[in-house]
Regions:
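Active-site helix of classical SDR
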Residues: 101, 137
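Residue(s) in the substrate-gating loop at a strand-loop-helix junction
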Residues: 121
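Canonical Rossmann dinucleotide-binding motif of NAD(H)/NADP(H)-dependent dehydrogenases/reductases
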Residues: 1-12
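SDR active-site lid
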Residues: 154-218
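Active-site-adjacent segment of SDR/Rossmann-fold oxidoreductases
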Residues: 126, 147-158
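Substrate-binding pocket helix/loop in short-chain dehydrogenase/reductase
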Residues: 77-88
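The beta1-alpha1 cofactor-binding region of Rossmann-like NAD(H)/NADP(H)-dependent oxidoreductases
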Residues: 40-51, 83
Length: 244
């Protein structure tokens, strides 16, 4: 997604865990003519998030785009996963994202027509096996950012919630199992998902067009509409679908 925004005149601040991967992405953005700065921080640690946002506020007067793409998934039954695992998922997927947003709101308000992009999931629209805490964290994102959108429309801040289905990324490799460890397995559904560059282009398009919500993926997106308009069909399919 960073590469879709990499162009002359843009200064990208790339932030996540893994300095080497961040720097590699930043260098790829620079080759496309963009300024790019790589900053490592940990969304699961509030003090790390605060240090990151303080660094941004000291060096910049405004933020034109804030795009949340970080997150961690889950592959465990609710009864098997301890509450500590649920808390960790919520800390990364929900509290980390909203802390960054709250801290940077003054810089977003200082911009002209600032835009926020939030990566949720189709699991933010319906529950699904092995994803109880993950789905809860995504449901929470919808509640927060839909409220934020209404609170700041007079500040010309648009909020786009992006709900991907199966995208060919390594997210399932790091999904937490019942022991709170990365499962280390690429799900077949993930491996056969849409290409990540296609997903990134659709995300950027939705953000720049001020779409409020967008669903990205393959035929699994139909489940969103089945849940809304034909609930019995949704539940019939969900019970029979392989959760991986």
């Amino acid at each position: 997604l960073a590469l879709t925004y990499a162009q002359p005149g843009n200064h990208l601040l790339l932030a996540a865990l893994g300095q080497e991967a961040l720097e590699n992405t930043a260098e790829a953005c620079r080759k496309k003519g963009s300024e790019a700065t790589a900053i490592e921080f940990d969304l699961s640690k509030p003090e790390s998030v605060k240090a990151f946002t303080n660094q941004i506020k000291k060096k910049h007067q405004k933020v034109d785009r804030l795009v949340h793409v970080s997150g961690i998934s889950q592959r465990a039954r609710a009864e098997e996963a301890s509450i500590d695992i649920d808390r960790k998922i919520m800390e990364i997927n929900y509290f980390g994202a909203i802390q960054v947003t709250k801290d940077l709101l003054p810089l977003l308000k200082a911009a002209t027509n600032a835009k926020i992009g939030v990566t949720s999931s189709i699991s933010g629209k319906f529950g699904f096996p092995l994803r109880s805490a993950y789905a809860a964290s995504k449901f929470a994102l919808h509640g927060f950012f839909e409220s934020l959108r209404l609170e700041h429309y007079k500040d010309n801040i648009s909020v786009t919630i992006m709900c991907p289905g199966r995208v060919n990324t390594p997210i399932s490799l790091s999904a937490l199992n019942a022991q709170g460890k990365a499962q280390g397995v690429m799900d077949p559904g993930q491996a056969n998902g849409i290409p990540v560059d296609k997903c990134a282009r659709q995300m950027k398009r939705a953000i720049e067009k001020n779409k409020k919500e967008v669903f990205i993926g393959g035929k699994e997106i139909l489940m969103v509409y089945f849940k809304k308009f034909i609930p019995p069909l949704f539940y019939r399919i969900a019970k029979k679908t392989n959760p991986t």
